[in-house]
């Protein structure tokens, strides 16, 4: 069973689309799940299944810790049910306007370095 990369992006966001396209190149190593963050957090969105308290905590955590990220990536281990935050910002080159804005070698390194169960995310 492969680990999963969960990509939280915004609709109509060209950077998010380019990141998603670049990360697809890792699909031989990971299952990839794309999540529209706005739809996810809508009142009737998928996050509603968590219940009001957990949903509120999740929204608060996103706002407090991930507001500096245009797109967020987590890796998930389905066997242990643990998640890890992946610092994608280190792999992005914002001077590029296509999927080459993601340096896949740096991203792979960040995926491997991401520690399960660490929250809030430690950023350098």
Curated annotation (Swiss-Prot):
Keyword terms of this UniProt record: Disulfide bond, Electron transport, Host cytoplasm, Redox-active center, Transport
SUPFAM superfamilies to which the protein is assigned, alphabetical: Thioredoxin-like
Main location: host cell
Keyword Cell membrane carried by entry: no
One GO location term (cellular component): host cell cytoplasm
Pfam family, one: Glrx-like
Superkingdom of the organism of origin: Viruses
Induction: Expressed in the intermediate phase of the viral replicative cycle.
Compartments, record wording: Host cytoplasm
Cysteine disulfide partners in this protein: 13-16
Role noted for this protein: Glutaredoxin necessary for virion morphogenesis and virus replication. Functions as a thiol-disulfide transfer protein between membrane-associated OPG128 and substrates OPG095 or OPG053. The complete pathway for formation of disulfide bonds in intracellular virion membrane proteins sequentially involves oxidation of OPG072, OPG128 and OPG088. Exhibit thioltransferase and dehydroascorbate reductase activities in vitro.
Assembly notes: Homodimer.
Family to which this protein belongs: Belongs to the glutaredoxin family.
UniProt name for this protein: Glutaredoxin-2
Organism whose genome encodes this protein: Variola virus (isolate Human/India/Ind3/1967)
